[in-house]
């Protein structure tokens, strides 16, 4: 693999440029009607991509080279999955909150699901607008079951490409839709969310200036290959393996040389999710 510049999505590292070496379905499909989300609504749903590349000078945060590659790759991938993709670039923290609030107030009753992708600098529990931090919980709370009723019981996917701390992973050698008869039942307001983080809590998240981030590269590749074959959690497991085994940082600074990364999936989904129906 060609060596190109690689960075991490953390506000605390400046001018770091290491390199990389590297539903509902008929029973004939094998998908259980009772155990999978209904994905045959008239529309698949919205996919909101917030792509923050340039930050206000007052923040001290560097430009995120390579993020436009991620945004373009995501746009193509989710359009191919029949999502309505809306790209937003360089949003302030206030604009992020306003956008998410407005989207949560839309009528999603004819949509099967919702996807939000956040590409930015970050820390644990935080994503950065171009002028400062936003608590991730503030963003996702707009879509809770008690606040966005038209998405209640539907999968809400948040994909987050950002650092979650300043730790570096050195690696180690190894051998190796609510049914009608259930409509009156209550469900937890936090149910049916999935958070796909690019890295484990506390760690850096690596991004390549030419090819985009390791995580988004891998996610798009696995969705393109398996979205019409596998359940989403199985796809994400393959994403984890791809990031863990196929990528490693290269830097003349020994501190940042030969580092690894593992994505982290937090699922509150209550059914299996298939993108095909």
Swiss-Prot record:
Record EC number: 3.4.22.56
Keyword Cytoplasm found: yes
Record Pfam families: Peptidase_C14
Post-translational modifications reported in the UniProt record: Cleavage by granzyme B, caspase-6, caspase-8 and caspase-10 generates the two active subunits. Additional processing of the propeptides is likely due to the autocatalytic activity of the activated protease. Active heterodimers between the small subunit of caspase-7 protease and the large subunit of caspase-3 also occur and vice versa. S-nitrosylated on its catalytic site cysteine in unstimulated cell lines and denitrosylated upon activation of the Fas apoptotic pathway, associated with an increase in intracellular caspase activity. Fas therefore activates caspase-3 not only by inducing the cleavage of the caspase zymogen to its active subunits, but also by stimulating the denitrosylation of its active site thiol.
Catalytic class of the enzyme: hydrolase
Subunit structure of this chain's protein: Heterotetramer that consists of two anti-parallel arranged heterodimers, each one formed by a 17 kDa (p17) and a 12 kDa (p12) subunit. Interacts with BIRC6/bruce.
Protein name: Caspase-3
Record organism: Pan troglodytes
Gene, per the UniProt record: CASP3
């Amino acid at each position: 693999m060609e060596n190109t510049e690689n960075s991490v999505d953390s506000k605390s590292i400046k001018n770091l440029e290491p390199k990389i070496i590297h539903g509902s379905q008929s029973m004939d499909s094998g998908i259980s009607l009772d155990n999978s989300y209904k994905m045959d609504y008239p529309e698949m749903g919205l996919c909101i991509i917030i792509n923050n590349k340039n930050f206000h000078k007052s923040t001290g945060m560097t430009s995120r080279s390579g993020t436009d590659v991620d945004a373009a790759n995501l746009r193509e991938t989710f359009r191919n999955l029949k999502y309505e993709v809306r790209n937003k670039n360089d949003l302030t923290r206030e604009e992020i909150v306003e956008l998410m609030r407005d989207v949560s107030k839309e009528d999603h009753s004819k949509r099967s699901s919702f996807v939000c992708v956040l590409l930015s600098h970050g820390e644990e529990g935080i994503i950065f607008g171009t002028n400062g931090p936003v608590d991730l919980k503030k963003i996702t709370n707009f879509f809770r079951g008690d606040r966005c009723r038209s998405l209640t019981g539907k999968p809400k996917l948040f994909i987050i490409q950002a650092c979650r701390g300043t730790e570096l992973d050195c690696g180690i050698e190894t051998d190796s839709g609510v049914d009608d008869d259930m409509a009156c039942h209550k469900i937890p307001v936090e149910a049916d969310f999935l958070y796909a983080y690019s890295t484990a809590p506390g760690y850096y998240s690596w991004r390549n200036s030419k090819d985009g981030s390791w995580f988004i590269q891998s996610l798009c590749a696995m969705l393109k290959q398996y979205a019409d074959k596998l359940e989403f959690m199985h796809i994400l497991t393959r994403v984890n393996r791809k990031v863990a085994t196929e990528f490693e940082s290269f830097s003349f600074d020994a501190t940042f040389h030969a580092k690894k990364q593992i994505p982290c999936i937090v699922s509150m989904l209550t059914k299996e999710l298939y993108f095909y129906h």
